[in-house]
């Protein structure tokens, strides 16, 4: 009798098992919990958004309190035009970083109430990002131009700062309109259908997908020819990066040339003492206040280039790559680089606070330590203290450079009144940006 359960009798049954993607199917393994609530990259992005938001609000609020405060301990020195430009930069940074981070956090955490609001929400978020980034860049350019005018033409006609600032805000809003119409919103991404078994290859990485329930903004360039994406990427790079960097390069180049031509000359070691008590700096040397403001403008320009360059470089590389035109707005790389670009708005106020003097003891100690590191020690014996820390007595007798004995004529031809010692130079510290 033939065995009914032998393999030769039973027909081969079709394989009706459904392949389960790793992390996307039902968790049928006993003793294990539910899958994570989101991808690690999304959680890290949310943490960075929160940190940048807190840092930006704290720094820019401090700058606004110092510049706009009345007479409290937060009030800083008043400089009319630069105060106005720095206040506008702080407001632009709050708008760029705070508005974008808040909208992005609300987008990620609250989810999507309706599918009909997808396009409006995506376009509004894109308008916030592009206009805030442009306003901050335009204010940095205006500060560099104002410093260039103050260094090269100190007695010339001042720049119309208020009109130029209003033009910068308006231009940022107008240039942000095209990016607002190249994105569209989708409903929350459902669970993707499983692919056929023949399409799965061993060792192949899983395809890029959206987390279930996550809302994404998609570009409109996927079904269009490739040159549409290239034209838009070129416009975005020129309007948001190339044009501001060109103006910043010209202004900072002029600042560096003036700084180099008016650099202070090293004093001679064996030069005889002058009859005047206070040796004023050479007329060709720039005042220390202008040098500090020049450094602040250069640092703001370098910070803008360093934070914005990765985003626009990756944008152009994705547009001109040989691969298929992917969804740039929905990729994780775009979101990560956008967070890096927002760090520019969070760090700008701390550049001003670093160069600006304050009443905080910790800040005074920091300036003292930095000044002792970056400033050359004065070699005059009259400026040195004794072994017990006691200073010379003449500092009480000639405390000011206008001591009246310095202007007396010689008593006779045979003898001259000994000149008073040179005044002690000011401590080299980053006290004020102006």
Curated annotation (Swiss-Prot):
<dbReference type="InterPro" id="IPR000276">
    <property type="entry name" value="GPCR_Rhodpsn"/>
</dbReference>
<feature type="transmembrane region" description="Helical; Name=4">
    <location>
        <begin position="163"/>
        <end position="183"/>
    </location>
</feature>
<dbReference type="GO" id="GO:0032870">
    <property type="term" value="P:cellular response to hormone stimulus"/>
</dbReference>
<keyword id="KW-0472">Membrane</keyword>
<protein>
    <recommendedName>
        <fullName>Probable G-protein coupled receptor 150</fullName>
    </recommendedName>
</protein>
<feature type="topological domain" description="Extracellular">
    <location>
        <begin position="1"/>
        <end position="3"/>
    </location>
</feature>
<feature type="transmembrane region" description="Helical; Name=5">
    <location>
        <begin position="238"/>
        <end position="258"/>
    </location>
</feature>
<feature type="compositionally biased region" description="Pro residues">
    <location>
        <begin position="417"/>
        <end position="426"/>
    </location>
</feature>
<keyword id="KW-0807">Transducer</keyword>
<feature type="topological domain" description="Cytoplasmic">
    <location>
        <begin position="259"/>
        <end position="293"/>
    </location>
</feature>
<comment type="function">
    <text>Orphan receptor.</text>
</comment>
<feature type="compositionally biased region" description="Pro residues">
    <location>
        <begin position="189"/>
        <end position="205"/>
    </location>
</feature>
<feature type="compositionally biased region" description="Basic residues">
    <location>
        <begin position="398"/>
        <end position="407"/>
    </location>
</feature>
<keyword id="KW-0297">G-protein coupled receptor</keyword>
<feature type="region of interest" description="Disordered">
    <location>
        <begin position="398"/>
        <end position="434"/>
    </location>
</feature>
<dbReference type="Pfam" id="PF00001">
    <property type="entry name" value="7tm_1"/>
</dbReference>
<feature type="topological domain" description="Cytoplasmic">
    <location>
        <begin position="25"/>
        <end position="43"/>
    </location>
</feature>
<keyword id="KW-1003">Cell membrane</keyword>
<feature type="transmembrane region" description="Helical; Name=6">
    <location>
        <begin position="294"/>
        <end position="314"/>
    </location>
</feature>
<dbReference type="GO" id="GO:0007186">
    <property type="term" value="P:G protein-coupled receptor signaling pathway"/>
</dbReference>
<keyword id="KW-0812">Transmembrane</keyword>
<feature type="transmembrane region" description="Helical; Name=2">
    <location>
        <begin position="44"/>
        <end position="64"/>
    </location>
</feature>
<feature type="topological domain" description="Extracellular">
    <location>
        <begin position="184"/>
        <end position="237"/>
    </location>
</feature>
<feature type="topological domain" description="Cytoplasmic">
    <location>
        <begin position="103"/>
        <end position="162"/>
    </location>
</feature>
<feature type="transmembrane region" description="Helical; Name=3">
    <location>
        <begin position="82"/>
        <end position="102"/>
    </location>
</feature>
<feature type="topological domain" description="Extracellular">
    <location>
        <begin position="65"/>
        <end position="81"/>
    </location>
</feature>
<feature type="topological domain" description="Extracellular">
    <location>
        <begin position="315"/>
        <end position="334"/>
    </location>
</feature>
<keyword id="KW-0675">Receptor</keyword>
<feature type="transmembrane region" description="Helical; Name=7">
    <location>
        <begin position="335"/>
        <end position="355"/>
    </location>
</feature>
<feature type="region of interest" description="Disordered">
    <location>
        <begin position="188"/>
        <end position="210"/>
    </location>
</feature>
<feature type="transmembrane region" description="Helical; Name=1">
    <location>
        <begin position="4"/>
        <end position="24"/>
    </location>
</feature>
<dbReference type="InterPro" id="IPR017452">
    <property type="entry name" value="GPCR_Rhodpsn_7TM"/>
</dbReference>
<keyword id="KW-1133">Transmembrane helix</keyword>
<comment type="similarity">
    <text>Belongs to the G-protein coupled receptor 1 family.</text>
</comment>
<feature type="topological domain" description="Cytoplasmic">
    <location>
        <begin position="356"/>
        <end position="434"/>
    </location>
</feature>
<dbReference type="GO" id="GO:0005886">
    <property type="term" value="C:plasma membrane"/>
</dbReference>
<dbReference type="GO" id="GO:0004930">
    <property type="term" value="F:G protein-coupled receptor activity"/>
</dbReference>
């Amino acid at each position: 009798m033939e065995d009914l359960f032998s393999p030769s009798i039973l027909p081969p049954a079709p394989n009706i098992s459904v392949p389960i993607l790793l992390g996307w199917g039902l968790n049928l393994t006993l003793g294990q919990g539910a899958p994570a609530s989101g991808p690690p990259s999304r959680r890290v992005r949310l943490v960075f958004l929160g940190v940048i938001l807190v840092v930006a609000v704290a720094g820019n609020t401090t700058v606004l309190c110092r510049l706009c405060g009345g007479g409290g301990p937060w009030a800083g020195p008043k400089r009319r035009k630069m105060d106005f430009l720095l206040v506008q930069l702080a407001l632009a940074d709050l708008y760029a970083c705070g508005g974008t981070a808040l909208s992005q956090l609300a987008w990620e955490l609250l989810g999507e109430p309706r599918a009909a609001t997808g396009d409006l929400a995506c376009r509004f978020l894109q308008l916030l990002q592009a206009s805030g980034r442009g306003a901050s860049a335009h204010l940095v350019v205006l500060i560099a131009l104002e410093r260039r005018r103050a260094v090269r033409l100190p007695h010339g006609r001042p720049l119309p700062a208020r009109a130029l600032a209003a033009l910068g805000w308006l231009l940022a809003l107008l240039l942000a309109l095209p990016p607002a119409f190249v994105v569209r919103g989708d409903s929350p991404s459902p669970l993707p259908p499983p692919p056929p078994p023949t399409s799965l290859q061993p060792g192949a990485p899983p395809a890029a997908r959206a987390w279930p329930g996550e809302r994404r903004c998609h570009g409109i360039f996927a079904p269009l020819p490739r040159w549409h994406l290239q034209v838009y990427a070129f416009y975005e790079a020129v309007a948001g990066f190339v044009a501001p960097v060109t103006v910043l390069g010209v202004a900072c180049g002029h600042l560096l040339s003036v700084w180099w031509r008016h650099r202070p000359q090293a004093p001679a070691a064996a030069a005889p003492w002058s009859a005047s008590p206070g040796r004023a700096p050479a007329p060709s040397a720039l005042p220390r206040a202008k040098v500090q403001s020049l450094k602040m403008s250069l640092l703001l320009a370098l910070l803008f280039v360093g934070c914005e360059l990765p985003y626009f470089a990756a944008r152009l590389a994705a547009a001109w790559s040989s691969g298929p035109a992917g969804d740039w707005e929905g990729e994780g790389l775009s979101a990560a680089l956008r967070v890096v670009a927002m760090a520019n708005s969070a760090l700008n106020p701390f550049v001003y606070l670093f160069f600006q003097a304050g009443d905080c003891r910790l800040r005074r100690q920091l300036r003292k330590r930095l000044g002792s590191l970056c400033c050359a020690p004065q070699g005059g014996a009259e400026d040195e203290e004794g072994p017990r820390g006691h200073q010379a007595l003449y500092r009480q007798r000639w405390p000011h450079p206008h001591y009246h004995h310095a202007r007396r004529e010689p008593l006779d031809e045979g003898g001259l009144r000994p000149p008073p010692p040179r005044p002690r130079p000011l401590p080299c510290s980053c006290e004020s940006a102006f």
